[in-house]
């Protein structure tokens, strides 16, 4: 596609857009499943909007990270293995499988450099409050903002890598 009239940057952005549209559809199905499973208690929760936004931003992080990995790995079996190792590793380090209050402080300090840590921090904060205090709301917005920054960094890395690969 390097001989195409469409610029490389536009091709990359359209690929990202396609991925986000497909991911958004799957996210919508997942949210509908959660609403069906929990009935009126979940959408009736005061924190429902925060939960929805948190999952949406985390989906953007996951999709952009997977796209970035896909730029480097061309074998689908290797891609699947790397994705499993990364996702399970982040889940173990960031408190998805093991509660954060049980984890060592040093592990938690390291996990702050991973997006799943902030996703879990927001979820734990939302789970602790039926009505968010001002401090809790600041903590939630900080976590969601950091997740969004991870997604933006990954997208910028995708654009830089694709540009480098096409110039090479």
Regions picked out by a protein language model, each given a short descriptive name:
Residues 27-49, 57, 71-76, 96-102, ...:
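Short helix-loop junctions at transmembrane helix boundaries
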């Amino acid at each position: 596609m390097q001989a195409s009239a469409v610029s490389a940057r536009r091709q990359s952005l359209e690929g990202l857009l396609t991925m986000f549209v497909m991911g958004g559809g799957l996210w919508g199905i997942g949210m509908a499943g959660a609403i069906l499973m929990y009935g009126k208690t979940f959408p009736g929760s005061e924190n429902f909007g925060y939960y929805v936004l948190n999952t949406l931003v985390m989906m953007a992080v996951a999709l952009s990270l997977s796209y970035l990995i896909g730029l480097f790995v061309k074998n689908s079996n290797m891609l699947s293995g790397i994705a499993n190792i990364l996702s399970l590793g982040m889940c173990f380090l960031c408190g998805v499988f093991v509660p954060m209050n049980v984890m060592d402080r040093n592990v938690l300090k390291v996990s702050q450099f991973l997006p799943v840590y902030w996703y879990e921090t927001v979820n734990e904060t939302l789970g602790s409050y039926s009505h968010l205090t001002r401090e809790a709301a600041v903590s939630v917005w900080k976590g969601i903002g950091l997740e969004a920054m991870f997604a933006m960094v990954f997208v910028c890395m995708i654009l830089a890598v694709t540009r480098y690969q096409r110039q090479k």
